[in-house]
Amino acid sequence: MPFDVAALVGCAVTTGVGAVWRTAGVRPGDRVAVIGCGGVGLSALMAAVAVGAEPVIAVDMTQSKVDAAKALGASAGVVWAGSAEATAEAVREVSGGGVDYAIEATGHGEAMQAAVLSTRNRGAAVLIGIPREETMLSVPARTIPRMERRILGSIYGSARPERDFLTTLDVYRSGRLPLDRLVSHRLPLADVNEAIDLMLSGEALRVVLDTSTEGTS
């Protein structure tokens, strides 16, 4: 097991993968949208692909992140359309009427709203992004009972680490969960400031710091 892949499983991967496998319980043939294609969102997306969801729709503010998601198995992509309503409408169009599960991985209020609005009858929005304390979620209340929509919160992918770390790594070894492709940059520990800048810029997927003697010299 490569150390850089194993390092990812401790947080971002477990959060994203668990939201799909544990919180939502996505099954083959379910329609899934993932809103926010950073490390957590892409982990969720790969997990949905691994269980046979179809379509799996990637949604992000930037075309480059949507393209990265397609390279990891997304069957379609939507670039943020300027509002929650417009973005959700695009997802509903691509999915043929809405998704069974919309996984929200940004923590932004509008993205959460888009997740709810993207779901079909009896669909669920799974909120894994952590919002600011003052963030409020506004959705058409009537659609919750009328459409039997659900809103599910997920912290750390509803995971039990002693079980789920091993499951995730087993699926990685099988080739169905290409976690190594999340590592976009590998830097020595001495370049930690550059690593932080890369993450803040949005250019990186996941940056792994090498703490070995060779990596810090």
Locations of regions flagged by a protein language model:
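NAD(P)H dinucleotide-binding glycine-rich loop of Rossmann-like/cofactor-binding domains
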Residues: 1-31, 35
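Adenosine-nucleotide cofactor-binding segment
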Residues: 34-37, 49-114
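N-terminal Rossmann-fold NAD(P) dinucleotide-binding loop
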Residues: 41-42
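Generic hydrophobic/aromatic pocket-lining and core-packing "Φ" positions
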Residues: 45, 66, 112-116, 141, ...
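C-terminal substrate-binding/catalytic core of Rossmann-like NAD(P)-dependent dehydrogenases/reductases
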Residues: 92, 96, 133-185, 193-194
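C-terminal hydrophobic helical "lid"/dimerization subdomain
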Residues: 113-117, 162-217
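Glycine-centered, small-residue-biased loops immediately flanking beta-strands
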Residues: 123-124, 149
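Acidic carboxylate diad motif detector
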Residues: 128-129
